Amino acid sequence: MTELSVLQAVRLKGRVTPADLAVTLGDDLDGITPIVEQLTESGLLVDGTALKISPSGRARLETLLAEERSGIDSATIAAAYQDFRAVNADFKALVTDWQLKGGPAGKPNPHDDAEYDAAVLARLDDVHARVVPIIDAAATQLPRLNAYSSKLLVALGKVNDGETAWLTRPLIDSYHTVWFELHEELIGAMGLTREEAARSGDAQ
């Protein structure tokens, strides 16, 4: 478990309990406790009812991410990012159709039409099949991104087993939560801020 991976996970979550942090990092509580305690004692994390990153933690994380970016092939990451943007548009449309009937200007989906819901959810397998090779390509430069394939697969399995909350529910590693965090990672790997990405037409 690295300093970078812990700080990045906490930043992406905003606020997270140690138990939930362990889950998202693919470890157990005992496994992450030493590094969490170290980062808290050094002032990089703030421990209260939940963990959050401190201003000095953000500065340290930016340094670590910049060091990480300095060793990557930027062309490979740029290609992965562009490929992701295309799949992201389709995933956003899927989520919109799950939440609203009739598109962005439609009405909230009451989920009382099993055939409609099944047709929307059926599109998730295609989205997943398209995003996994993109993650694989990005992970040749940033191996820690491999974890996103595993987390998306777990969420996909739960959705396909009928636990549809795992498509979009916040505060758990739902498909949408993990997707959002992967998007943030790719934006960061490009050396962009979210605002800069949005100006280029890449909105979440």
Predicted regions and their residues:
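Short amphipathic alpha-helical interaction segments
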Residues: 25-41
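Short amphipathic alpha-helical interface segments
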Residues: 1-27
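C-terminal regulatory/effector modules of DNA-binding transcriptional regulators
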Residues: 154-204
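Exposed, interaction-prone assembly regions rather than primary DNA-binding/catalytic cores
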Residues: 75-164
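Intrinsically disordered, low-complexity terminal tails/loops enriched in metal-binding residues
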Residues: 15-17, 75, 79, 100, ...
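A short, conserved structural fragment
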Residues: 40-50
